[in-house]
Amino acid sequence: YRAADKAAALGADALIVADTAVMAHCRREHPGLRLHLSVQASATTHAAIEFYRQRYGIQRAVLPRVLTVQQVAQVVRQSQVDIEVFGFGSLCVMVEGRCTLSSWVTGQSPNNAGVCSPPGAVRWSETPDGGVDAELGGMLIDHYEPTESRAYPTLCKGRFMVDGRRGYALESPTSLNTLALLPELIAMGVAAIKIEGRQRSAAYVEQVTRVWRQAIDRAAADPARFDVAPAEVAALARHAEGQQHTLGAYERPWR
């Protein structure tokens, strides 16, 4: 409550919320403050979003990264609130951040602490071969060779020995990138693109948002002729996990 009250006092434009008690408090104490339903509420249908609109007065909902483009379009058509979708950043194999793996290792809830890997639980150490070990909560989750770039250390994207082979046991580091879908997302009425930014640097924020701002402006001005520029792909690849991009559930190639 105190964080919400302070944000309102400072003149915040909106709050991103998942906790229903906080929503109820804000609607009662700060009726003029916009409430955006967090992705961690896991609202994937019009009915779920409508419940939050009627009960708590939300004005925008952030959709989880589990829907196809067609499903997103259906939610946009049926909803009476703005719809925001993820456009770039890390993917989550858990229920959008509510990760029991991270909680088990660090003793902190990512949902409440706001980070997958709390800084105090992360430890980097050089090894005799010139590489680097990455530990989370005292558990070794990866080893990087001297020539390898290091990724944001999360348990779900660590490399472990399984059946005598070392590799990614749960998920390979790959970033969501929906630049190619911009004309389609704009046409269906998506209100905003969300760029994942947990524990990212100021340089990441500046460079990634600059690329997306330019691409969105071009797509909005002339959607029929929009094409992703190679320079944009290269710029985002520098910030992509594993330097790989995917459309994720938006296209579901695994079906």
Q: Residue ranges of each PLM-predicted region?
A:
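Active-site pocket-lining/capping segments in soluble small-molecule metabolic enzymes
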Residues: 1-43, 62, 70-192, 199-255
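Short, glycine/polar-rich helix-capping loops at beta-to-alpha or helix-loop-helix junctions
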Residues: 44-48
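A cross-taxonomic marker for long C-terminal extensions/tails that follow the last structured domain
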Residues: 55-58, 85
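Cys/His-rich Zn2+-binding cysteine-cluster or related metal-binding knuckle/ribbon modules and their
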Residues: 65
